[in-house]
């Protein structure tokens, strides 16, 4: 029974203050890339009660109204009323961007080890992961957590539950048997709400309208512990309830804790930053390995040195699920995927304004047309090369 256990992941809605910051950072990145695809962008955002601060390093010839981009993002999320914690119309927006350091630029613009390529924008380690728990090849707990807060947003936006406000969090605990999802044990959903709604009415509506439609029937075995707004009240939320910062939801953004994380956040960073682009490439590799049937679970670690194009290491682990050895899979990866920064950008077509959409509800496991790292177009070649 050593392989029977409980595992939990969480997600947050687009109105969570840290996600507000992520979305503003990525909206600014998109606005710049739309005019200047080779810009260098590291856009950080802080949001608090009535205040947005934009800081970081940007080198570009694009002409972007950063303040208006921030306000538009708040409006699109739903922060159009001071009662919600911040109002796009009246909040203060402070801008404090510098240019990228020339000491960094000289190693990124031209690699020290490869005259035809750009170097990595920083040192670091990144992970990619995929498993066969869902059709999207994602771990089930983070998949369900994302779907719950997505549904909260959907019912808020279409007016079916018009007392919902933008800020919300979800958490799902699954029981695993023999290493596979067996049943849902606990679902937590906390949502910001209007003052007038009673807790009893709120809990009933959240369970029946938000939670139950999301849960897969095959994972419902016996009573589920539903915890809805367990504090009893969640009127004050968003940037008023907590200060939001870019890059503070890196586990929500990735695999919900089911795989390691190298520590680098994604939002606000252009694709020369391997924190983002190599993590996307890692997901692309791992997903294609699993889609090819080479393993039911795949983890890849990639590492880089600043100014150097070629990865300093590539590691593959299939946790004993591989049809061929991990070493052979690693060899196939090196033969089929260009993991140099410029190779990744070309392979995944990353110099496009596609990032705002990634900044809420997960960067992975969403088969959006722009999310090239979710494609499984290399699976057939991997399978053939493996002789399966």
Swiss-Prot record:
Membrane-crossing residue ranges in chain numbering: none
Subunit structure: Homotetramer; dimer of dimers.
Keywords from the UniProt entry: ATP-binding, Cytoplasm, Magnesium, Metal-binding, Nucleotide-binding, One-carbon metabolism, Potassium, Transferase
Pathway: Amino-acid biosynthesis; S-adenosyl-L-methionine biosynthesis; S-adenosyl-L-methionine from L-methionine: step 1/1
Entry EC no(s): 2.5.1.6
Classification lineage: Bacteria, Pseudomonadati, Pseudomonadota, Betaproteobacteria, Burkholderiales
Chain spans, region Flexible loop: 100-110
Protein's UniProt name: S-adenosylmethionine synthase
HAMAP family per record: S_AdoMet_synth1 (MF_00086)
UniProt: ATP binding residues: 16, 167-169, 233-234, 242, 248-249, 265, 269
Named cofactor requirement(s): Mg(2+); K(+)
Principal location: cytoplasm
Binding residues annotated for Mg(2+), in chain numbering: 18
Catalytic activity as recorded in UniProt: L-methionine + ATP + H2O = S-adenosyl-L-methionine + phosphate + diphosphate
């Amino acid at each position: 029974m050593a392989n029977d256990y409980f595992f939990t992941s969480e997600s947050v809605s687009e109105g969570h203050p840290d996600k507000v910051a992520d979305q503003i950072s990525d909206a600014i990145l998109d606005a710049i890339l739309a005019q200047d695809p080779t810009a260098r962008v590291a856009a950080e955002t802080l949001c608090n009660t009535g205040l947005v601060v934009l800081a970081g390093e940007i080198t570009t010839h694009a002409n972007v109204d950063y303040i208006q981009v921030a306000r538009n993002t708040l409006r699109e999320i739903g922060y159009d009323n001071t009662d919600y914690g911040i109002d796009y119309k009246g909040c203060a927006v402070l801008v404090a961007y510098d240019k990228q350091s020339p000491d960094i630029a000289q190693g990124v613009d031209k690699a020290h080890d490869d005259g035809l390529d750009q170097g990595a924008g920083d040192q670091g380690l990144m992970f990619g992961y995929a498993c066969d728990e869902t059709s999207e090849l994602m771990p089930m707990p983070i998949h369900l957590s994302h779907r719950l807060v997505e549904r909260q947003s959907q019912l808020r936006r279409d007016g079916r539950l018009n007392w919902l406000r933008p800020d919300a969090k979800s958490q799902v605990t699954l029981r695993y048997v023999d290493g596979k999802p067996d049943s849902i044990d606990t679902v937590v959903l906390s949502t910001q709400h209007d003052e007038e709604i009673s807790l009893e009415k709120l809990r009933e509506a959240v369970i029946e309208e938000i939670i139950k439609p999301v849960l897969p029937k095959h994972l419902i075995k016996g009573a589920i512990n539903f915890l809805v707004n367990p504090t009893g009240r969640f009127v004050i939320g968003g940037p008023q309830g907590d200060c939001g910062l870019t890059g503070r939801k890196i586990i929500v953004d990735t695999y919900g804790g089911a795989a390691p994380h190298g520590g680098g956040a994604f939002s606000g960073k252009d694709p020369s930053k391997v924190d983002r682009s190599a993590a996307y490439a890692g997901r692309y590799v791992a997903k294609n390995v699993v889609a090819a049937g080479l393993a039911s679970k795949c983890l890849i670690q990639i590492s880089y040195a600043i100014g150097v194009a070629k990865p300093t290491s590539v590691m593959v682990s299939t946790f004993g699920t591989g049809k061929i050895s991990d070493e052979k899979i690693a060899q196939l990866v090196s033969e089929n995927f260009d993991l140099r920064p410029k190779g990744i950008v070309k392979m995944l077509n990353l110099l496009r304004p596609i990032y705002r959409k990634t900044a809420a509800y997960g960067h992975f496991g969403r088969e959006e047309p722009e999310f090239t790292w979710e494609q499984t177009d290399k699976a057939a070649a991997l399978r053939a090369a493996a002789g399966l």
